[in-house]
Regions:
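N-terminal juxtadomain amphipathic helix
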Residues: 59-61
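Exposed, interaction-prone extracellular/peripheral surfaces
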Residues: 1-36, 52-57, 66, 71, ...
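A positional/architectural concept
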Residues: 40-44
């Protein structure tokens, strides 16, 4: 099984992006096109008109004055601002070369970035990328632009490994700090990464980013992150690059492993909830398009 997707497959995802809710210039109250705008607040909406309510419309946009005057439900409709900058921060560390069901994390991360990138590009937004974790002491940066050829170059980079080795210091923290320094205020930033790790060291940077930007966390998960299979004694590599031997046949050990994962995810969810950051997990055994749609619907209900 390949560790990375074919470039042609990432290019084909532009067709699915049309139904994701980002790539529509229709009024944003319709069931799909309204989803993205209503979840990722702070991108800016321009008032369009008042019209009659249709089934499936977002009732939070009801115009109660017109409804009372006409004795018929009406709501305000909006269009998104003409453009914004979207930055896709994508984890390409060695831990992304992992997957026990469906496919590898690296492939799901690339598919996620492709769907979001195509959708944003179709809205005439500036799309850029920050690929981290695969090159010593640096990250590959793609400046946000509306040029579709630049998006093609980003997707091409995602269709293969980044040359180099994992840096000793925290590559995700470095990427977030680089995004903090180099991204225009008011941008929409997606962090597409393996977040099954210690989060405390990231909390302050995530908080500062969320104050200046619309931030979205997309953890790339595998079932084995939570439920360790019985493989006997096995060697694993942690996020620091250290080899760790685990006796996976021990039921109590697997329970401790599951508890540790749950505590880590609960802490991440708590940070996201406190900072009002959407948290949209994507698993290796799920369809990326469906995962994003489900995650956005859940995030909207929590707003």
């Amino acid at each position: 099984m390949a560790l990375y997707p074919r470039l042609d497959d990432l290019l084909e995802l532009r067709h699915q992006a049309r139904t994701l809710g980002l790539a529509s210039h229709h009024l944003v109250n319709s069931s799909f096109s309204g989803l993205y705008a209503s979840v990722f607040r702070g991108t800016g909406l321009d008032f369009e008109e008042v019209r009659e309510y249709h089934e499936g419309d977002d009732i939070r946009n009801m115009d109660w004055k017109v409804t009372a005057r006409t004795n018929s439900p009406h709501l305000k409709t909006f269009r998104e601002e003409r453009e914004r900058s979207v930055l896709l921060c994508i984890d390409q560390g060695p831990h992304m070369s992992f997957g026990t069901r469906g496919t590898f994390k690296s492939i799901q991360a690339a598919r996620t970035a492709a769907l979001l990138g195509w959708a944003a590009n179709s809205l005439n937004d500036r799309v850029g990328g920050l690929l981290f974790g695969g090159q010593a002491n640096s990250a590959h940066h793609f400046r946000p632009t509306k040029d579709r050829r630049a998006l093609w170059r980003l997707l091409k980079a995602l269709s293969g490994p980044i040359e180099g080795i994992e840096p000793a210091k925290d590559p995700l923290l470095n990427a977030l700090q680089r995004a903090e320094r180099g991204t225009a205020t008011g941008s929409l930033i997606f962090v597409i990464a393996d977040l099954n790790r210690e989060i405390t060291s990231l909390e302050a940077t995530i908080g500062r980013l969320s104050q200046r930007h619309s931030l979205v966390l997309v953890p790339i998960d595998d079932k084995a992150d939570r439920d360790l299979p019985d493989l006997g004694r096995a060697l694993f590599t942690d996020h620091a690059g250290n080899l760790v031997e685990i006796e996976t046949g021990d039921e109590s050990g697997r329970d401790s492993y599951r508890t540790a994962w749950e505590q880590t995810r609960q802490f991440l969810a708590g940070v996201a909830n406190r900072l009002r950051i959407p948290l949209i997990p994507v698993s290796t055994d799920e369809d990326v398009h469906q995962s994003l749609m489900r995650g956005m619907r859940q995030a909207r209900r929590l707003q």
